[in-house]
């Protein structure tokens, strides 16, 4: 169960990083 939460939080973090990365690229 703990491993599942770690993987889930990791995927969520990557999604947020990609989302904000694309937004910053569009702003520039």
From Swiss-Prot:
The chain crosses the membrane at residues 2-22. Keywords: Cyanelle, Electron transport, Membrane, Photosynthesis, Plastid, Thylakoid, Transmembrane, Transmembrane helix, Transport. GO terms for molecular function: electron transporter, transferring electrons within cytochrome b6/f complex of photosystem II activity. One of its GO terms (cellular component) is cytochrome b6f complex. It is found in: Plastid, Cyanelle thylakoid membrane. GO terms for biological process: photosynthesis. It comes from the Eukaryota. Coiled coil: none annotated. It is a single-pass membrane protein. Belongs to the PetL family. Component of the cytochrome b6-f complex, which mediates electron transfer between photosystem II (PSII) and photosystem I (PSI), cyclic electron flow around PSI, and state transitions. PetL is important for photoautotrophic growth as well as for electron transfer efficiency and stability of the cytochrome b6-f complex. The 4 large subunits of the cytochrome b6-f complex are cytochrome b6, subunit IV (17 kDa polypeptide, PetD), cytochrome f and the Rieske protein, while the 4 small subunits are PetG, PetL, PetM and PetN. The complex functions as a dimer. This is Cytochrome b6-f complex subunit 6. It comes from Cyanophora paradoxa. The gene is petL.
């Amino acid at each position: 169960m703990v491993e599942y939460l770690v993987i889930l939080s990791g995927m969520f973090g990557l999604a947020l990083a990609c989302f904000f990365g694309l937004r910053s690229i569009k702003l520039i």
